Each structure stands twice: as structure tokens, then as C-alpha cells.
Amino acid sequence: MRSTIKWLAILLLIPARWTVGGEVKRPKILGVAHMAFYVSDLQKTRAFYKDLLGFEEPFSLKGKNGADRIAFIKVNDYQYIELFAEPAKQDGQLNHIAFYTDDARKMREYLSSGGVAVPDTVGKGQTGNFNYTIKDPDGHTVEIVEYQPDSWTAREKGKRMPEGRISTHIAHVGVLVGSLEPSMKLYRDILGFGEFWRGSSSGRVLDWVNMRVPDGEDYLELMLYSKLPPPEKRGGKNHLCLMVPDVEKAVATINARPARKEYVKPIEVRVGTNRKRQANLFDPDGTRIELMEPKTIDGKPAPSSTAPAPSSEYRGGLK
């Protein structure tokens, strides 16, 4: 509720087309850095990403008990999937989403000038990159990352990217959103994300809004709801999308791997509302990993929906 009140207060103080601070220029936001999930069994989830999907794990971080606490699954030199071996919190399996910038410190100043709560300073994380977090209107944790030349990420540049991995690119991350306008104020008006598509499965109410980062091709998918799913069901909504050139070939590759015998769920290829071929897989905790082609089935853009946003039981923080 505090998150809701804070963002409603910000909405009252800014015009619809807001340039933050007037003098503080927004640094570049270049793309999705990673998406982080809580996992109940780290070894099983590692097997899902490594044995079934073909990714590698260049490094991990240990907890106070000496056991692995966070595993880093590498998609490419700039994008990772982070697995937290910790109990899930109020947002289901979602820990946080992250975007990378060319200047984290200036981004902190920029966000602060617009009334967004930020830390007092920008420090280096355990892997050596500048980073800090903010909260969006729905209570999702959003990390801002600036890659550093002496970081673990830089150390692994050009490495641990096998040809057999199922994808080379995280196209988007998707998160549940209960009230569209506060999210648009943060992601569109403050962070500069550009809306490029709206989708509706029924034609009566809006389901998705796609927002591209201002200085790259990756995007954020806002997953609108009228009734908030319980935490154990949010893994199908809060999701990560891996781009593949041919979904049917990708599924055939997965089906041919020995690890497929351990993955008992069916993998179906279908055409989404956005008219792109896609297939969904689910990790051991039910978090959805979407495989999707970059183009529509006929090369023509899918029309954007004009359906209204749902009237939701919105509660800031997704409690």
C-alpha cells in the first residue's frame, strides 16, 4: 500500500509528458541485463538450464553457510539468468529484473531528481559491477547495472557460450502489473521506455503492454491482471523470453537431449496473439521460460489492441 501511495503522489506532481529534473539528462538504458528467480532446489534448476537448455554457469556466489546461494546462468556476454537458492517471497518466484546502463551513478542522480527513491551511493556488487535497486509501482525490485572492465562478467567475456545453447538472447522480461498508469509513469515517462505493442487475448480487455528500452532492442512486457494470482501461480506470468530463430527446431533440439526424459511436461509450438511462433517451458518451480521467434508468421506486424486496461484489485507491492 505504501508503494501505491508514493507513486500516486508522484503522479500528482508531474505532467503527463514529464522530463525529469529539467537539467539531469538520462543516461542510456541499453538492454535487459538479467532476470533473477528464487528456486527451491538449485541442483534441479541448474539441470533445467544447463542440461535441457544448454547454457553454462560461469560463476556462483556462496552464502554464509558455505553452500552456493546464487548461480549465474550465462545467455550472452551482457545477459544472465540468476538463480537464488532461497525461499520465495511475496512476488512468487520472482526476485528481481535488471537493466544495464552506460552510467549507473548518473542514472541514480537522474532518478533521484524525479522523485524515485534511490540509495545514497552506488557501490559495486560481489561480481564487480556497479549496481543498485529501485522499486516499481507494483513493488517489483528493479536493478540498475553498469558493467565494469574488472568484473567477473568482463572476465568471462567471450567464454561459456556453447553453440548448442537454445538461445543467444533474452528478448524480454515480463512482470505482473495491477494498474497500468503508474507503471507507464515510471517506465515510459521517467526511464524512457517506448511502447510499441498492446495485446488482448479476448479483444475485450487489455492483457499485455510491450515497452522497449530507449537505447536497445530488448523490452519489458507488462502483464496486466484483473485478479492477482496467488504467489504460487505467478511463475506463469512473471517470465523470461528467449529469442530463437526457429521455434520448431529449438523444440526438436530440446526433445533430442537426454535431459528431456526428466522434463515430463509437453512442449507445444503455437502462434501467440502477437502472431509469433512460441513455446513455453517451466522450470522445476513453475517459472515460465518462453521461446519465441523474432518475426511474425507472415512478416507483417501484429495490430495493437485498443481494448481498455482491466479494472483490477490493484495493490502496490503485490502482497
Where are these regions (language model features)?
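Sec-dependent signal peptide recognition
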Residues: 2-10
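Hydrophobic h-region of N-terminal signal peptides that target proteins for export
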Residues: 10-19
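Vicinal oxygen chelate
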Residues: 22-28, 30-41, 61, 71-74, 86-169, 197-203, ...
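Core segments of cupin and vicinal oxygen chelate
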Residues: 27-30, 36-80, 175-219
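Sec-exported extracytoplasmic/periplasmic mature domains
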Residues: 50, 54, 103, 112-116, ...
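Amphipathic N-proximal alpha-helical interface segments
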Residues: 83-86, 145, 222-225, 292
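Structured core of small recognition/catalytic domains
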Residues: 181-270
